[in-house]
Regions:
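N-terminal intrinsically disordered, cationic/polar leader segments
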Residues: 1-110, 118, 122, 126-137
Length: 137
């Protein structure tokens, strides 16, 4: 089944990015990242080709940067959240059951993680935030 699935669209929406630069006396920090709930919708027809149906994956991932001051206080240095939408096509010859989707959920989650990482890096790149390596992908 997976060999016949094609990614045709990746989009982001509702980007929220807040950056509070590190203050002097602040040590290096860390970050927390989460993908959030992933929703899967399947079965709609592709408008440009009726022989194909689509799988639409949506998620609302976020990553939060944290730093610790010399007195032990923890501060949020950045917060990035956005909506992520991936659209895949598959031929109508595949009987896409809920069980088949569940068996292959890992594939869709992996793609969400890859594009989450890519989008985060692109948004953070022009800022003063450096040397963050998201573990996804």
């Amino acid at each position: 089944m997976l060999s016949e699935i094609r990614l045709i669209e990746v989009s982001t929406s509702n980007i929220h990015f807040k950056h509070t630069p590190l203050k002097s006396g602040t040590n290096r920090g860390n970050f927390e990242a989460e993908i959030g709930e992933i929703t899967v919708e399947a079965g709609k027809k592709l408008k440009s080709d009726e022989a194909l149906s689509i799988i639409e994956i949506t998620a609302s991932p976020k990553v939060v940067g944290l730093s610790t001051t010399s007195d032990g206080a923890i501060h949020e240095t950045f917060n990035l959240q956005f909506g992520l939408r991936l659209v895949f096509t598959y031929p109508d010859s595949i009987d896409l059951t809920p069980e088949l989707l569940d068996e292959n959920r890992w594939f869709f989650e992996y793609n969400v993680k890859i594009f989450f990482k890519t989008q985060c890096e692109q948004i953070i790149k022009p800022t003063t935030i450096k040397n963050i390596e998201l573990p996804f992908g």
